[in-house]
Amino acid sequence: MNIKNILWFTLKKLSNLSLSISLLLLIASISIIGTIIEQNQSIVYYQMNYPINNQPFGRIMNWKIILNLGLDHIYLNPCFVLVLVLFFCSLLACTFSNQLPSLRNARKWKFLQYKNHINCNNHFVELDKISICNIIYSLYSNNYYIFHKENNIYAYKGLSGRIAPIVVHFSIILTFIGSLISLLGGFTAQEIIPTGEIFHIKNIIQSGFNSEIPNNITGKIKDFDIKYGPDNSVEQFVSKIIIYNNQGKNINQKQVSVNSPLILKGITFYQTDWKIDTLRFKIGNSKIIQQPIIKYKINNQILWSCRLPLNKEKYIFLVIANLNDKISIYDISNNLLTSIKLDETIVVNNTTLKIVEIMTKTGIQVKTDPGIIVTYTGFFILMLSIVISYISYSQIWVTSIIQNIKIAGSTNRATLTFEEEIINIQEIYTQYTWS
């Protein structure tokens, strides 16, 4: 078997519709797994959420299986990328070997000159009395493109409906190319920054082979705020970000929220998460003390707490429910002693206490996606092609034999509408021929 035969055999296998559908279903299945299993998390996260001793699912899916199979970064897994490449090649092969030749064949003028060819079509009408001019006018009135040769007529309309499958293939290929550009040239960084601090893009959690991390900009979190609803639930959290260049010049700033990112030269800054980091306070006449705060989840409610020593023997616990409420103070027996506001001084067990500041951190995701325009263009063309696919491709053949005109037609969809068109053509022809 020579190289030409091998290439032809490979092309034939790749252009197989069953293979394309199987690959598409495989891609969809892998994507579902990637949606169920959280991506790009730490090993500790998977150990906590997918323990081996979890019955009965621990034997089927645990953290070791997830890490060994690469399910923690499934969209970057070489096997998934290989499936995408195969699907891409299958679409290309199908487009050039099946769809384009089919379109070229559809554009040919097809005159059927023999009675058996006419009669074998889906719709057939025979009219008395011959008038080529009137039948042409009847077809033209129904928006058909008409070709006339001797005693034969070929007409069609809705050729764009035949183009739709090619456009679908092209849009999927374009979407794949956009995703590939993003995969190779994009990066994602995640930063947790205290309010008022300057940050650099350094905590890279995902990067492409050809991605470039910008080193000529720095950012600063000037302010952070949380908006609460009437029931004290978090509705929105907002960070004011200032971007500086290497010379320290302010080149952009914006109040960033969850659905309103900052975009600068193809780099997007998203608001992701937030947390209370540290509590600053004074005990008695001491200097300002900083105490880390630990996050808890109790009865589906998020709380932050820290333990403060009043002296060598006595401790109290400070509990924060949200930034708008007072800070609750408990003793070691979990009894509520009192509540305190920021900058308020109270006396607890003969010791003065003043809360100076609640220090928060905001989560900022920095991302570049160079293929996003190509991807969105592919999706737009895909939606457009779906609309185009509903256009019926209809063909009509007319031939005059002795004293009769034989009309045959076929369509790829909307059969009832096409039958109505045949009847309308017949009525117009009869009206002008017999009047």
From Swiss-Prot:
Disulfide bonds: none annotated. Belongs to the Ccs1/CcsB family. It comes from Gracilaria tenuistipitata var. liui. The gene is ccs1. It is found in: Plastid, Chloroplast thylakoid membrane. May interact with CcsA. This is Cytochrome c biogenesis protein Ccs1. The chain crosses the membrane at residues 17-37, 77-97, 163-183. The lineage of its organism: Eukaryota, Rhodophyta, Florideophyceae, Rhodymeniophycidae, Gracilariales. Keywords: Chloroplast, Cytochrome c-type biogenesis, Membrane, Plastid, Thylakoid, Transmembrane, Transmembrane helix. InterPro entries: Cyt_c_bgen_Ccs1/CcsB/ResB (IPR023494), ResB-like_domain (IPR007816). GO terms for cellular component: chloroplast thylakoid membrane.
